[in-house]
Structure formats: C-alpha cells, structure tokens
C-alpha cells in the first residue's frame, strides 16, 4: 500500500474542485513517493479539515478534491514566547513545538539576545512541513518580533506569563500552570539581573526554577510544551 502524503494549501477547499499544490509538494509526491496521476493525496488548509484528493495534472501541480475525511475541529495547544536564538536552533525549536501542538509563537528580543530578526519565509515553511508531518489540522501563528518590555505589557490577571530562570529565588511554580498561561524561553545567555527583577515586580509574571540542569533554549521550549500536554490533553 502506497503512503498517502499530506500537503498544506492556503486556498479554500470544497468538494470536487481543482487545487494547485506547490512544486515542492508535487515533487515529493511524484519523484520521492512515485505517485502518478489518479493517485491519492491528502490536503488541508488549517480551517477546512482534511480532504482526500487525486493527482490530476503533474506538470501543472493540480489535484482534485474528492472527499472530506477529517472534519474541522479545534486543536487545543499552548502559547509560547521565545527569545531569538541561533537561526538553526530556532528552526529546530519551531519545528518540534509545532509538532507538539503550539498555537502561537512570539519571538522576543531581550538584553542578551544576539539575533534581532528571523527568516519569516523559512520559518513559515518549517511550520507548514511540521504540520504536514504531524497530521495537524491547524497552523500555528508566528508573530512579529517584539521587545521584551512591550511584550510584558500584554498580560493581565487572567493570563500569566511563566518564565523559567536559573535562580532559585522565584515567585511561582510551574505546577500552578493554567491552561491559557504562556511560557517565555530565554536567550542563550539567559536573562539579565535587571530582567529577572522586572519579572518579579510584575503581578502578571511568575518565575520558576527549572532545576539544577541548565537547559538550552530549544530544550526548555520542548519541555514546557510537553508539560502542558501532560496536564491538559
């Protein structure tokens, strides 16, 4: 039995219409998986569920929708903010937390952040491919880069920001995580003393001690998402 690949398309999907997939997607289907015209693929757009389609025209990258096989549904997942880190490591982090079900990703600039921007086109492609691979129906949002001080102003008593720090004198505990709380991952150099003091002064921010082991930023992000899943899924 041939493997049936899943592909994301940005277009609206309905019954018995022609859709154009990307050259990359058609190459994977026909050159890697050796599919031919008439063979089946699966398509999703983040809002309309998952559809079984048939390859119609390989040269023009056209498929035809046949049947809705997974209805649209909400996919609960956490939100995370992360200081920008080395582009390769940032890409790995985004890929893994997307597979785990993150809903929103907020890139943040802190005092020790060495990188101020990210390659949006590349990151969005990584997100799409991670959703295709993990059988997600929804696509997480990668937001614009924001300064840490401005980011802290987004929170209220109804939503808290949890920050993992390397010091033991903290104001909270990750066990107190609520479903709509957000986690902030620090940069490769950690947070400055001024930033930690700023966290401790904010009522909407809780710091917690991640343990004796010093985690890489991408590891901390994955660990938090895994903890959220264990508690709420």
Predicted regions and their residues:
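N-terminal positively charged helical leader segments and presequences
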Residues: 1-71
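Short, ordered loop/turn segments at secondary-structure junctions
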Residues: 12, 68-69, 110-113, 212
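Glycine/charged-rich beta-loop-alpha catalytic/anionic-binding loops adjacent to active sites
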Residues: 19-21, 75-79, 180-182, 202-210
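RNA substrate-binding interface of SAM-dependent RNA methyltransferases
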Residues: 71-160
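Active-site/ligand-binding-proximal alpha/beta "capping" segment
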Residues: 155, 159-198, 204-208
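Structured adenosyl-cofactor binding patch, chiefly the S-adenosyl-L-methionine
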Residues: 193-233
């Amino acid at each position: 039995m041939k493997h049936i690949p899943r592909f994301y398309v940005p277009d609206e999907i309905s019954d018995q219409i022609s859709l154009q997939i990307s050259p990359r997607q058609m190459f994977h289907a026909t050159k890697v998986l050796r599919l031919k015209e008439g063979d089946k693929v699966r398509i999703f757009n983040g809002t309309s569920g998952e559809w079984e389609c048939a390859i119609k025209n390989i040269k023009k990258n056209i498929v035809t929708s046949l049947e809705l096989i997974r209805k649209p549904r909400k996919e609960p997942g956490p939100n995370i903010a992360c200081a920008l880190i080395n582009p390769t490591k940032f890409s790995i982090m985004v890929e893994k937390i997307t597979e785990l079900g993150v809903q929103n990703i907020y890139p943040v600039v802190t005092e020790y952040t060495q990188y101020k921007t990210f390659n949006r086109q590349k990151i969005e492609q990584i997100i799409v491919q991670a959703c295709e691979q993990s059988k997600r129906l929804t696509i997480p949002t990668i937001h614009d880069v924001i300064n840490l001080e401005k980011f802290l102003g987004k929170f209220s008593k109804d939503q808290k920001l949890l920050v993992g720090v390397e010091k033991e004198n903290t104001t909270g505990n990750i066990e107190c995580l609520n479903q709509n709380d957000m986690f902030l991952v620090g940069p490769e150099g950690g947070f400055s003393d001024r930033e930690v003091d700023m966290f401790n002064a904010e009522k909407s921010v809780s710091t917690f001690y991640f343990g004796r082991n010093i985690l890489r930023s991408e590891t901390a992000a994955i660990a938090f998402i895994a903890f959220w899943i264990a508690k709420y899924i």
